[in-house]
Structure formats: C-alpha cells, structure tokens
Amino acid sequence: MGAEVHYLNAIEALDQGDREKAASEAKSATVLDPEHLEAWGIYVEACLPPLGMQPTMAQAASALSAVKRIVALDPTRLDMWLRGGRLMADELGMLHDALYWWQDCREHLPDEVTPIVEMASILADMGEYAQAQQRLQSILDDNMDVGITQFRKINGLLQLVRVAATQEEREIFKPYEKHHNGWVAIRQKMRKPPVSESLIFLMTAVPILLLVVMLLGRYSAPSWSAVCLNTLVILIIILVMMRNAKRWFQLLNRPAFNLLRAMNFEAATGYTVIEEDIRTSVLYMYIMQRKPTSWQERMLKIIDNGQRLPNNWRLRLPDFSSHLEQAFHDSATVHEDLPASEEE
C-alpha cells in the first residue's frame, strides 16, 4: 500500500477512536513518505489521548518527536510550534529546552508575537524577571501587531515582571543557590499546604462586610437612594478585599512558589537540588499531585537517577537576538540572488 492509503486509514481509525491503529497507520505513511505533513499531523493527534485526558510521558515524548519533524519540514506552522512548546514546558517540564524552541521559532517567524510571550512567561517562572521584561518590552518597542486578547495578557505579564524586577537580586529565589534564604522559608512552611485565595478573601472580607451591613442597616434611611449607596459601598469593599486577597495570597504562599520553582528547575535540568526532608513534606506532595501525569513520571525518573547539580553549573540562555542575524542573512541571500539589472 502507498503512503496515501495508510494516511486515509489513519484518519478513519482516528475518527473511530482507535488511536493505536491510527498511530500505526500514520507512522507507516511517514515511513513511505517522510515529508507527508498531514500524516505526521495525524500521528501527533494519535499519540496523545482524547481531549480532557492527560498524556503519559511516553505519549508526550512521541508527540513531541513528531512535532519536531513537522516544523523541520514546514517552519511556518505556528500551531505546531505552539503545540511543541506546550508539550515541552507544561507536560514534560523542559523549560530550558522550551526557551531554545521558541527562539528557534522566532528565527523562522520573526513577526509573530506568540514566541516572545511564551519565552517571557517561561523566564518569569524561572525567576529571570529582567530578561522577561526585556522580551515583553521588545514587543512594544518594535510596534508589533498584537490582538486585543494578547495585548491584555502581555500588559498584565509586563506589569507583573516590572514589579518583580524591582526586587534586589538576592531576594529573588534561585534554586541552584544552596544557601539562599528561600530554602529556610520553604522549611518553615513545608508541613502545611498553601493557603487558598478564596479562604484569605473569606477570612478578611466576611467580618468587615457583616460589620458594614449592620452599621448601614442601623444608620441609613429606608429609601432607594440609601439602598443604592449601600450597594455601592458593599461592592467597593468586595473589590478592595479581592485585590488585597490576591496580594496576601502571593505573600503568604511565597515559600510554596519558591518550592514550585525548585521543582520546575529539577524538571528542566535533570539535576536534583531539593533535600529529602523537603521532598517528603506535605507542601511538596501537594504541588506534585497537581502536576500533569507526564511531568510527574519524568520527575520520578530524575529523582530515581539522583544526580546532584554540579558545582560549576551555569544557566545558559539562548541568544535572544539570533532572529535578527537570521533576518539579515536571509536578506543578504535574497540580494545576492537578484539579477544584475534588478540590483541596479
């Protein structure tokens, strides 16, 4: 059978919910025709479980391998760049690889905003706030085309990293620093799960609201204007307390966010930095249980391997200006290919 027949069989099997057969047929099609993009796309879909289910590490790795083949054949497929980035960062925890992935995407699609936003988000999660701010600021400086939804996300993320970047460098938790004060804070809070934002809101807002309602009911006149004024006062209090709850949530749960960053660091590097007493704590288990299945499987392999972070380890970020060099190279190549009459 030809590649096209296997491809059609894969589509039929996928429509029937037989993902194993679909993957087998799609793989057969790509063996016969390694440049069959549609077959590779079906293979990606067949490797991953149905919507709403989490993939295993093996499924995520197989899908990622196929995605890499697709973008190698057609670098303009932003949807596949996005899927590959999400598989790396969200499902497998490969944050450092995801940074290089998105910079590679930007070399091929320099006018797209998505790679910059994704890199900034990853850098912020890693605690590299200054780098994240530079990436986001470049969107505004270069006057890139941004949709309304993307602009809101960019603006919110930019405000977040601007505030975080104002911290002193020693205050920003870096998991690879053994004697950072963040480890002390983690040990102090590791016996309890993090406090939820809704609980903070209820504990702070409800007593104040009850007191205000009692006072308004006692001293306000029974009229429509009084009802409107009372409603406005209550609404303002709720909005203020919601904002305060978000701020207190960040402050009270800073040790939990630090531990999350340390766990992400281990997943990204493959080295262990968390001590055993922290790894068996309530806080660690709470965070671990809320990670994707594939992420947990990969982390367990890293823990079993038990390779400690080397003393000479250094964070190596991609060259964030490589897309400019690539654009210059492409421009020079086009110029060289022009006929002499056109050059004149």
Regions found by a protein language model. Name each.
Residues V5, A39, M80, P115, ...:
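TPR alpha-solenoid repeat register
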Residues P50-M57, G93-M94, Y129-Q134, L158-M190:
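Alpha-helical linker/edge segments of TPR/alpha-solenoid repeat scaffolds
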Residues G2, H36, R77, E112, ...:
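Residue-level recognition of tetratricopeptide repeat
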Residues M1-L32, I42, L48-T56:
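Alpha-helical segment of the N-proximal tetratricopeptide repeat
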Residues Q16-E25, L51-A66, L92-D104, G127-R135:
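Structural signature of tandem alpha-helical TPR/SEL1-like repeats
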Residues G2-N9, D33, R261-E344:
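Charged, low-complexity cytosol-facing tails and large interhelical loops of integral membrane proteins
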Residues K192-F265:
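Transmembrane alpha-helical hairpins and terminal membrane-anchor modules
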